[in-house]
Amino acid sequence: MAAACGPGAAGYCLLLGLHLFLLTAGPALGWNDPDRMLLRDVKALTLHYDRYTTSRRLDPIPQLKCVGGTAGCDSYTPKVIQCQNKGWDGYDVQWECKTDLDIAYKFGKTVVSCEGYESSEDQYVLRGSCGLEYNLDYTELGLQKLKESGKQHGFASFSDYYYKWSSADSCNMSGLITIVVLLGIAFVVYKLFLSDGQYSPPPYSEYPPFSHRYQRFTNSAGPPPPGFKSEFTGPQNTGHGATSGFGSAFTGQQGYENSGPGFWTGLGTGGILGYLFGSNRAATPFSDSWYYPSYPPSYPGTWNRAYSPLHGGSGSYSVCSNSDTKTRTASGYGGTRRR
């Protein structure tokens, strides 16, 4: 080597040494790693709500993550979003992200987040490490539907709307209020249907007062079951010849007893309560949605794999869906952030 690199071959020896250095140092520095990509060369990203990014230096993150907006993150969850590289603005890559959204929602602020290969300032990123963070806002139509929903569903919509915008502490208080309301409803139902209330006799009757007692205590069918009002057991045959003689008195007494809160009052009350506490419980009745935990399981030897979240995690949903839901292609625009 020394003999070959004479005074006239100094340039050749320098190139040969540089070549040997690149052959040995390149793989060590990851220059030939197929997972190391120049971000500007990435043309498109297809991201899924139930998958995680790859990782090398940091922990993996969800490929799709809602971070806020006027509609909140629980009202609607897009399943797949595709982002296209729209060019370089002199600072970083700019993206256009599209998906099918309910006509009540639109994208707010969006940003593509990728893991730098060596650091957060590296122009090269790890393949598969990019995810999208987005805000979900209401459209004008969505705001109109929200207002109409509040007018139509009354107390249920108001309570759910309050729950949606309140903090976690206030949610606990609203849950306590709900329990108190349900207990009150149970008490009303008990008083209407199950409690055998005592009613005073009518102010005037042309028959002797003992006729009512005779009808009630000489009935061959016996007294009503414990816990139920006697007037709900219906007319009962006495099994005696006095039936014809005291029939009008029995009818008058029964008519008086049924004049209080009875079957039709309970039926109307049940219908109103069923309407208020039925299926229309959400403040944003547009669609169902679920999302998964924001942190994947950690397993050794899986640094460069895309994770899928475990099922059974915390979720949020809206039970009030619209069968006439319409969708359209929505777009969001934003830049890049390296982590």
Curated annotation (Swiss-Prot):
A Pfam family assignment: SARAF
GO biological process: calcium ion transport; regulation of store-operated calcium entry
InterPro entries: SARAF
Keyword Transmembrane tagged: yes
Transmembrane segments: 174-194
Biased composition (Polar residues): 318-330
Signal peptide location: 1-30
Major location category of this protein: endoplasmic reticulum
Role noted for this protein: Negative regulator of store-operated Ca(2+) entry (SOCE) involved in protecting cells from Ca(2+) overfilling. In response to cytosolic Ca(2+) elevation after endoplasmic reticulum Ca(2+) refilling, promotes a slow inactivation of STIM (STIM1 or STIM2)-dependent SOCE activity: possibly act by facilitating the deoligomerization of STIM to efficiently turn off ORAI when the endoplasmic reticulum lumen is filled with the appropriate Ca(2+) levels, and thus preventing the overload of the cell with excessive Ca(2+) ions.
Domain notes: The cytoplasmic C-terminal region mediates interaction with STIM1, while the N-terminal lumenal region mediates regulation of SOCE activity.
Subunit structure: Interacts with STIM1; the interaction is inhibited by the interaction of STIM1 with EFHB.
Record protein name field: Store-operated calcium entry-associated regulatory factor
Species assigned in the record: Homo sapiens
Lineage: Eukaryota, Metazoa, Chordata, Craniata, Vertebrata
